[in-house]
Amino acid sequence: MSDINIKIGLAEMLKGGVIMDVVNAEQAEIAQQAGAVAVMALERVPADIRKDGGIARMSDPKLIKEIMSVVSIPVMAKARIGHFVEAQILESLGVDFIDESEVLTPADELNHIDKDSFKVPFVCGCTNLGEALRRIGEGAALIRTKGEAGTGNIVEAVRQLRQVNKDINYIKNADKSELMAIAKNLQAPYDLVTYVHKNGKLPVPNFSAGGVATPADAALMMQLGAESVFVGSGIFKSADPFKRARAIVSAVTYYNDAKILAEVSEDLGEPMTGINCDFEKFSQRGW
C-alpha cells in the first residue's frame, strides 16, 4: 500500500464524526468527552483571529504537546499555507494530521506545501473542485470546504460544497473526450479528473468546515454530502460548550432524523455571535 493510500485510510477513519477546535488541554478533554473524533489544536479560534487581526501563525509546540498529552483521539494542528517548516515542526511533534490552513496568514502566495514529502497526512481547504484536485495533486489526504471560519455563518460552506458537488456531477456525465479540456479549465491534474469521471467522487474524503455553529448547520452539511464536519468557534464561543458539542456530534450521527435533531437542538443556550461574510474572506487565501 502506498503512503498516500495509508494517509487516506487514516482520514477515512474520521468519517461521520466531528473535529473540534480547542485552545487548551481543558477544552480538548471536553471535546473528547462530548464525542469528538479528533481535535484541532490552536492558540486562537478563528473568531478571535478575525477580531484580533495581525499575523496568525502555527501554535506554540508546548500548547500542542499539552493537548496531545490529555486526549487519546487524533490531534490536528494548523500550518500556514506554503510554510513547509511549520509543517516539519508539527510532524516532529507527532501530530496526527496537519491542516494547511487559510485561517492562518499565508506564508507563500504562489506555492502550497509539497505534502507528498511528509509522512503525516494533510488536510486542505477548497472552494471548488479545481482547488480540491490541485491540493490532492500535491498530496492532501483529506479535503474540506473552507467556508468562512470564525463567522458562525454557514452560507459560504453551503455554496462551496454545492459547487464541488455540481462540478463532480458535470465531470461524471461528461464525454471522455472532454476530460482534457475540463482539466485545463479547472487547472487540475488530468489523472484526478479522470478519477472523478469514473467514480463520481473525490479520491479522498470530503468534509465540511467554516461557519458551523448549530446542530442544524452540521446536519445541513451532512445532508449536502459532507462526510464529516469541522467545528471551530461555534462550540467554545457558545454559552454551554459541552452541551453544544454533544448536540453537534448527535446531529452528525443522526443528520437525517428531524425528530432527533429537534431534541438535541433544545435548550443549548446562546450560540456564538455570528457575523456577516462581507469583509476579508479567509476562503480567498490560497488558490
Curated annotation (Swiss-Prot):
Reactions listed under catalytic activity: aldehydo-D-ribose 5-phosphate + D-glyceraldehyde 3-phosphate + L-glutamine = pyridoxal 5'-phosphate + L-glutamate + phosphate + 3 H2O + H(+)
Binding site for D-glyceraldehyde 3-phosphate: 162
GO molecular function: pyridoxal 5'-phosphate synthase (glutamine hydrolysing) activity
Domain of life where this protein originates: Bacteria
CDD domains found in the cross-reference section: pdxS (cd04727)
Pfam families in UniProt: SOR_SNZ
InterPro entries (UniProt xref): Aldolase_TIM, PdxS/SNZ, PdxS/SNZ_N, RibuloseP-bd_barrel
Root EC class: lyase
Residues the record marks as active site: 78
SUPFAM superfamilies named in the record: Ribulose-phoshate binding barrel
EC number: 4.3.3.6
UniProt key word Transmembrane: no
Binding residues annotated for D-ribose 5-phosphate, in chain numbering: 21, 150, 211, 232-233
Swiss-Prot/TrEMBL keywords: Lyase, Pyridoxal phosphate, Schiff base
GO BP: any one term: pyridoxal phosphate biosynthetic process
Pathway: Cofactor biosynthesis; pyridoxal 5'-phosphate biosynthesis
Subunit structure: In the presence of PdxT, forms a dodecamer of heterodimers.
Family listed: Belongs to the PdxS/SNZ family.
Described purpose of this protein according to its UniProt entry: Catalyzes the formation of pyridoxal 5'-phosphate from ribose 5-phosphate (RBP), glyceraldehyde 3-phosphate (G3P) and ammonia. The ammonia is provided by the PdxT subunit. Can also use ribulose 5-phosphate and dihydroxyacetone phosphate as substrates, resulting from enzyme-catalyzed isomerization of RBP and G3P, respectively.
UniProt name for this protein: Pyridoxal 5'-phosphate synthase subunit PdxS
Gene: pdxS
